[in-house]
């Protein structure tokens, strides 16, 4: 099943806030919020996520501040995937209005409120709606993620080269 555009967008925003918060004053808010989200899938999964968060935060804390952005780029795709999987697992028939989606939005907003401006650069907010809308974002230092809406009809090109 193809991932819904809202899942990719929300997971990317949440993951950006999470890795941006690591090794910062906003870390505890981010960690506690994400662990609470995964607790919905059971205590074992929440414990595994908590352990991974602690490992990632420790790695970032031990990394030279000049090299932290590179490590964050490496951590970002895994957290985006984990959050996307969680959102898809709990989307049910309500989709973007699920309790998990609402809670992730709340956690992300709380973390953003605590992050300094340089740390907020890790959070990318992309929203596109309407027929033919395209949302594109760069993650992990060069990975481009595209979400396409329903294509709008386009007039035929009059250029012989097809442009």
Predicted ranges, named:
Residues 1-8, 31-131, 146-163:
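Short amphipathic alpha-helical segments that predominantly mediate membrane engagement
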Residues 8-16:
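Pore-lining and gate-forming transmembrane alpha-helices of multi-pass membrane transport proteins
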Residues 16-29:
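Short hydrophobic alpha-helical membrane-entry/anchor segments
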Residues 22, 138, 143, 147-148, ...:
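Residues at secondary-structure transition points
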């Amino acid at each position: 099943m193809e991932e819904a555009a809202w899942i990719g967008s929300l997971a990317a925003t949440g993951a950006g806030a999470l890795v941006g918060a690591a090794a910062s004053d906003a870390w505890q808010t981010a960690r506690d919020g994400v662990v609470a989200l995964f607790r919905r899938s059971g205590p074992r999964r929440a414990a595994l996520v908590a352990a991974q968060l602690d490992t990632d935060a420790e790695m970032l804390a031990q990394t030279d501040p000049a090299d932290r952005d590179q490590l964050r780029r490496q951590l970002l795709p895994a957290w985006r995937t984990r959050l996307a999987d969680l959102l898809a697992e709990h989307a049910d028939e309500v989709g973007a209005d699920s309790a998990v989606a609402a809670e992730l939005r709340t956690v992300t907003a709380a973390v953003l409120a605590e992050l300094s401006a340089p740390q907020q650069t890790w959070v990318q907010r992309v929203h596109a709606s309407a027929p033919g809308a395209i949302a594109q974002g760069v993650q992990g230092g060069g990975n481009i993620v595209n979400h396409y809406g329903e294509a709008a009809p386009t007039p035929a090109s009059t250029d012989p080269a097809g442009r």
